[in-house]
């Protein structure tokens, strides 16, 4: 069943669901064994407190650094408030799952206890080097007579810092391809005049784009994980990414890509060329694929079910102690 709730869009941030009184009898009537809270804020906190009173186990998932987004936009007061609020929410739940070691540390440093790592899976059948399309690559190279194709995949929003790619867009031998859509697209089209914007892609079409190009570059500094990087690695496409956040769990520096300060334009340019012209690039591409081959969705989901079981047993033990 799906229950719709109202939401609020805070300035420049993603919409957030709001509590609704009708949820309490709905949850009590449904009587779940465990409640999974994805990126809980207002609605999630409300449900977590309901669950606590009803002795229903809760698992919260930390997957969006909303406080970091606020800081990026210069909303210092909002950043500090959201940081404390997020910690308070996750401290209300029985277990918090975070997608990267960085995200786990971030929560623990904020005072959240009982945090465990739960990464993301990747579709290894769809995202594979076999999806490389030489004709697609040649089509993009023809626009400017470039030598290499660089791809960015992700939401086109200010916090993703896609404009940091301007130094790459200015190089005549590099063709930048932007895959995605978002509120910053119009501005980015002006700031990256040589880039090719192909819009939102998914499924096999997305895999074909990621697998066909020479290097994937990601510039967002508030990623708790970054699924786009993982999908790129699965395609055997090496990555240049930020040396902070979730990407540090995914990119093996010097082996499957490079971790750098992507805001340093000269370092970014040097790093991209370093990868493109690396004598062992073919070995790095093989290593990229190998690095994620164990992360099937079956394996990841099985680990989630184990977390559910652990929490259910833990709360049951707590009930027995109280009784």
Pin down the residues of each PLM region.
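Nucleotide-activated donor-binding/catalytic signature segment of Leloir-type glycosyltransferases, i.e.
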Residues: 185-204
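A short, well-ordered alpha-helix in the C-terminal region of glycosyltransferases
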Residues: 280-294
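Nucleotide-sugar donor phosphate/pyrophosphate-binding loop at the beta->alpha transition
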Residues: 57, 68-88, 98
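Aromatic "clamp/platform" in nucleotide-sugar-dependent glycosyltransferases that forms part
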Residues: 221
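Short hydrophobic beta-strand element within catalytic cores of glycosyltransferases
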Residues: 238-241
């Amino acid at each position: 069943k799906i229950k719709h709730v109202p939401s609020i869009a805070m300035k420049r941030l993603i919409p957030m669901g709001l509590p609704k009184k009708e949820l309490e009898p709905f949850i009590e009537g449904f009587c779940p064994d465990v409640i999974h809270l994805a990126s809980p804020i207002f609605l999630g906190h409300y449900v977590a407190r309901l669950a606590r009173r009803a002795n229903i186990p809760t698992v919260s998932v930390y997957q969006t650094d909303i406080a970091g987004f606020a800081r990026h936009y210069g909303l210092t007061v909002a950043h500090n408030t959201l940081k404390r609020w997020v910690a308070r929410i996750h401290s209300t739940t029985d277990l918090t799952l975070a997608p990267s070691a960085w995200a786990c540390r971030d929560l623990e440093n904020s005072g959240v206890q009982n945090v465990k790592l739960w990464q993301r899976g990747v579709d290894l059948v769809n995202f594979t080097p076999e999806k490389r399309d030489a004709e697609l690559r040649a089509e993009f190279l023809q626009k400017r007579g470039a030598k290499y194709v660089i791809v960015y995949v992700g939401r086109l929003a200010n916090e993703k810092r896609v404009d940091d790619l301007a130094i790459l867009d200015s190089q005549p031998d590099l063709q930048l391809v932007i895959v995605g859509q978002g509120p910053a697209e119009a501005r980015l089209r002006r700031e990256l005049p040589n880039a090719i914007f192909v819009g939102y892609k998914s499924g096999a079409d997305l895999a074909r784009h990621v697998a066909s190009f020479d290097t994937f570059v990601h510039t967002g500094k508030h990623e708790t994980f970054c699924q786009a990087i993982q999908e790129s690695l699965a395609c055997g496409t090496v990555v240049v990414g930020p040396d902070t956040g979730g990407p540090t769990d995914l990119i093996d520096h010097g082996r499957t890509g490079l971790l750098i300060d992507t805001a340093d334009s000269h370092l970014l340019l040097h790093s991209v060329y370093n990868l493109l012209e690396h004598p062992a690039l073919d070995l790095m591409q093989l290593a990229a694929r190998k690095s994620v081959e164990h992360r099937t969705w079956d394996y990841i989901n099985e680990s989630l079910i184990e977390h559910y079981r652990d929490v259910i047993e833990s709360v049951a033990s707590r009930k027995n102690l109280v009784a």
